[in-house]
Each structure stands twice: as C-alpha cells, then as structure tokens.
C-alpha cells in the first residue's frame, strides 16, 4: 500500500506524515495506491482555507475520491478520514471488518465558500468530451468521485447531460433539449430538467446574485452544455462540453 501526499502552500512540516498515519488503517491492502493533495489557499477572508483531496485506486480497477475543506489541520485530517470511510462504503468489501458496520453521521459536504461578488473571477476554463454512459452509470461516477455534478453523454438519447443531486437519494439531469429516452426505468427516479440558454456573463451574474454553488446552462452562441461552479478558493470555474453540436439553433 502506497499513500502519496503532495502539498501546496504553508502547511505544518508533519502534515504528510499525519495524513498517512490516519489513512493507512482505513485503506488497508485493498487500496494499492492512494494520492492525497493538501493545499492552503491564499485568498484572504476564507473561513476554510485548508483543502484536502484523496484519490484512491482500489484493487479491481475501482476508484473513489473525496474532497474536504476545514479551518484547521486537525479538523482537515479528521474530516478527510471520515469522508474516505464514507466513500469506501460504496465498495464495502475493501473496508476492514470493524469499519464496515460504522455508520458515518456527517452531513453532506458543504459547498465551497465564495468571496464577495466584487472579488470573484472565472479563474479556470475546462473543456471535455463527455463519455457515453447510462444515467445509472453517471450516478455511480458522481458518487464514487465525490463530484457535485457530472458531465456525460446519455447513451440512448445521445445528448450531452449533467447529473446532480437534488436531495438524499434523488438526482436531476440537465439537458439542452430534454429527452426522457434512457431515463424511464431508472432507480431511483431521475428528474429531467432543461439547461436554459444563456451567455457566460449571464451565468456569472446569476451566481453573483444567488450565491448558489453551481449554474447549469446551454451556452447561447455554441449550443454546448456548461456548468459554472464555485471553487474552494472562492472564485468560479467553467466546465463545458467540447463534443460536436448537431443542432445549435437556440431554444424552441
């Protein structure tokens, strides 16, 4: 078992050793390689400037991921350990026997805190070609990778789609032109929603106004599905599909 720890920013000199000490009993022999990234954010005014992310490669090809933020290093390590156990419950056979029956009581992770609107910027633009999969497979990725949303191409309707949680055990899928093909027999049921046509500045203005952690929309000029979302540094990032658009004539 190998736990690689990388750091960024000013952190305690023993941070990597403390993280390994807490995670080693949890990961055991079923996780041959895990990567942890510890970061202290430099933006002033953040209440939770410490961020940790773990990516666990499990035997059998499975992966799980978790990301947490905290005000202190001790809280960060504790939250990371608890969240890692919670994520590994998706594959309970990899957990030590004493942890399989452990019920975590953490509430859902809090969304990143935002800087005041005047100080926010879109600091990252990322494009990806969505992978074709079913809605159920997309939910599995969403949960295992601890994503707030997941961009994919729905296998049957062949539409770019974004899936998000809409409550405990409930999910919503956004599409530019909602098509229920492939969603009729899903369990749990999935709500289908339209990704409204919008410009990027309009999406930024909505998040500035509402303080919401994410805005899903269809970019007005390209017809591509996008997600504008809050980063842990208090700024915004933009994720968009780079797949070819067959019909980008705008809303109905």
Q: What is each stretch, according to the model?
A:
Residues 1-252:
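N-terminal, polar/charged subdomain of small-to-medium soluble alpha/beta proteins
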């Amino acid at each position: 078992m190998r736990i690689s720890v990388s750091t960024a920013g000013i952190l305690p000199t023993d941070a990597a050793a403390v993280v390994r000490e807490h995670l080693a009993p949890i990961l055991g022999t079923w996780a041959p390689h895990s990567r942890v990234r510890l970061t202290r954010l430099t933006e002033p005014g953040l209440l939770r400037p410490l961020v940790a992310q773990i990516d666990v490669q499990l035997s059998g090809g499975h992966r799980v991921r978790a990301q947490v933020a905290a005000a202190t290093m001790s809280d960060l390590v504790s939250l990371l350990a608890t969240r890692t156990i919670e994520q590994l419950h998706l594959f309970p056979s990899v957990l030590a026997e004493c942890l399989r029956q452990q019920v975590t009581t953490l509430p859902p992770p809090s969304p990143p805190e935002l800087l005041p609107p005047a100080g926010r910027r879109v600091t990252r633009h990322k494009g990806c070609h969505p992978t074709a999969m079913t809605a159920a497979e997309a939910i599995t990725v969403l949960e295992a990778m601890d994503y707030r949303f997941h961009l994919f191409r729905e296998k049957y309707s062949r539409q770019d789609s974004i899936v998000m949680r809409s409550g405990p055990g409930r999910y919503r899928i956004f599409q530019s032109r909602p098509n229920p093909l492939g969603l009729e027999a899903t369990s749990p049921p999935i709500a289908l929603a339209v990704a409204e046509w919008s410009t990027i500045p309009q999406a930024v203005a909505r998040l500035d106004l509402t303080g919401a952690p994410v805005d899903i929309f269809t970019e007005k000029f390209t017809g591509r599905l996008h997600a504008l979302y809050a980063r842990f540094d208090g700024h915004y990032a933009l994720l968009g599909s780079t797949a070819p658009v067959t019909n980008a004539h705008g809303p109905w």
